[in-house]
Amino acid sequence: MTDNTSAPMYTLRGLQLIGWRDMQHALDFLCAADGQIKSGTLVAINAEKMLAIEDNAEVKGLIEAAEFKYADGISVVRSIRKKYPQARVSRVAGADLWEALMARAGAANTPVFLIGGKPEVLSQTEQKLRAQWNVNIVGSQDGYFKPEDRQALFERVRDSGAKIVTVAMGSPRQEILMRDCRMICPDALYMGVGGTYDVFTGHVKRAPKVWQNLGLEWLYRLLSQPSRITRQIKLLRYLAWHYTGKM
């Protein structure tokens, strides 16, 4: 019988990544059978994030400090498989992992706190989570708050008893907030989710499943938003690392 409560670690350019075989492995790793949730910070790693780690010391420190770094991008998965031919690792997309965690939280009545997004998007996210999975949302805060309100927010998270805290503020803002909130409320699983609330509520269209399964979600985004071309060109440096064995 396969043990889903542990997972191997793989190293790419000095960064330790969890190797999950599939979504079920990820869920069983993070959520125990008795309903207990691991404490720590989840960070999705793709090629763009790998470049940010190299170029920005603050981002590097934030991401290296996170307990659970996993392969969100297909390019990162391919790099792991190239460097470790025996690795049984698959892409676990952050948006899909968030939905799976919310479904599991609803079934187990795990308290959830949502942070980030526009007020109307956050409200729609709450409504849909309750309707779809009966998620026990014990608090929320949109992304439009003042720096002086941060401490009060952290205390609200702590006092809510939340065991899962998801933060949709983009990188590195969400990683900074999760790090600081954990100093006040350490006993929870924190997950940075970027634009996931927008996708979940239908405000942003995600690539069709066939594109995702082919590892071409990046191409779909580029065709949908040609302005992303500059960001995509920067990823050529990652490809150079991959093909020259510098991972």
Curated annotation (Swiss-Prot):
It holds the Pfam family Glyco_tran_WecG. Pathway: Bacterial outer membrane biogenesis; enterobacterial common antigen biosynthesis. It comes from the Bacteria. InterPro entries: UDP-ManNAcA_Trfase_WecG, WecG_TagA_CpsF. It catalyses: UDP-N-acetyl-alpha-D-mannosaminouronate + N-acetyl-alpha-D-glucosaminyl-di-trans,octa-cis-undecaprenyl diphosphate = beta-D-ManNAcA-(1->4)-alpha-D-GlcNAc-di-trans,octa-cis-undecaprenyl diphosphate + UDP + H(+). Keywords: Glycosyltransferase, Transferase. GO terms for biological process: enterobacterial common antigen biosynthetic process. GO terms for molecular function: lipopolysaccharide N-acetylmannosaminouronosyltransferase activity. Its EC number is 2.4.1.180. It is an enzyme of class 2 (transferase). Belongs to the glycosyltransferase 26 family. HAMAP family: WecG_RffM. Catalyzes the synthesis of Und-PP-GlcNAc-ManNAcA (Lipid II), the second lipid-linked intermediate involved in enterobacterial common antigen (ECA) synthesis. This is UDP-N-acetyl-D-mannosaminuronic acid transferase. It comes from Enterobacter sp. (strain 638). The gene is wecG.
